[in-house]
Design a protein with these regions (language model features):
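Conserved ABC ATPase signature
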Residues: 144-148, 152
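Conserved ABC transporter NBD signature motif
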Residues: 63-71, 228
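A short, surface-exposed alpha-helical micro-motif characterized by mixed small hydrophobic
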Residues: 211-213
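ABC ATPase NBD coupling module
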Residues: 16-18, 72-88, 106, 114, ...
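Helix-to-loop junction immediately C-terminal to a conserved catalytic motif
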Residues: 55
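C-terminal boundary and immediately downstream tail of ABC-type ATPase nucleotide-binding domains
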Residues: 237-259
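Conserved ABC ATPase "signature" region
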Residues: 122-139, 248-249
Length: 259
């Protein structure tokens, strides 16, 4: 279980001496082992900052983060190394998060070598299994990221995350920039993958439509705070907060534009 209690994360305002703002303010969230949770909000709402705190990329300025009872928000490097693979972060810019000089085989082998100390033959076999899981052709191994399509790059990032055998995967705006057809293909693939592996997914998105399609629970975030939480929402009419209703209007406007 991944659990955050009263998380606050502050940043200094550029050009403002000794002036800080709360990117995340007193946020608590709990992710069980399995299921899909979504955090939805506009750009600047603090959701990506929260994702970085939950994945130990950044330490909170206040509050605590626990993974299976271990307070990872105060762990040193050695302790973090032991749990590093348990929470994986898949970023928005797939190509930017992949080493352009490595081929796919090297990208997938790295976590297998560092986290599990696998020998060469076992790494090779596991890479093939990961490609199959991500629905990538096996000859992809010899290619570099820049030679892959946008959809293939997304799937490669997912395969790399799976290589760590995580309990939780956080998708930070990972589906932005995909056209409607490709986006649905990726989302359907992830839903099937989550059901198969029973990994906990946290979907960070500005798109309430994506959150409704994917998630069992939705947290609406605004100005660093979670302002509304719905468990198993059935329709957009379940959202009550005025800001949440603005997000609903944005979805409906987008749908009309696509008709």
């Amino acid at each position: 279980m991944l659990k955050a209690e009263h998380i606050t994360k502050q940043y200094q305002i550029p050009g403002g001496r000794h002036t800080v703002f709360d990117a995340v303010s007193d946020v608590s969230i709990e992710l069980g082992n399995g299921g899909v949770t979504a955090i939805v909000g506009e750009s600047g709402s603090g959701k990506s900052t929260l994702a970085r705190v939950l994945s130990y990329v950044e330490r909170p300025d206040g509050g605590r983060v626990f993974l299976d009872g271990l307070e990872v928000s105060v762990c040193g490097r050695r302790e973090l190394r032991a749990v590093r693979g348990k929470v994986q972060l898949v970023m928005q810019n797939a190509l930017g998060s992949l080493d352009p000089h490595q081929n796919v085989a090297s990208i997938l082998e790295e976590p297998l070598r560092l986290l599990f100390h696998m020998g060469a033959e076992k790494r090779k076999q596991r890479c093939l299994e990961l490609l199959d899981m991500a629905r990538l052709e096996r000859d992809t191994l010899r290619h570099r990221p820049g030679e892959l399509s946008g959809g293939q790059q997304k799937r490669l990032c997912i395969a790399r995350a799976l290589a760590a055998q995580p309990q939780h995967i956080i998708f930070d705006e990972s589906f932005s920039g995909l056209d409607v057809t490709l986006k649905k293909q990726v989302l359907d693939f992830l839903k099937e993958l989550q059901t198969q592996l029973q990994i906990s997914f946290l979907v960070i998105t500005h798109d309430l439509d994506t959150a409704m399609y994917m998630a069992d629970a939705i947290h609406v975030m605004r100005r660093g705070k979670i302002i509304e939480t719905l468990e198993h929402p059935r329709s957009f009419s379940d959202f009550q907060e005025p800001y949440s209703q603005e997000l609903v209007k944005a979805v409906r406007s987008k749908r009309r534009a696509l008709q």
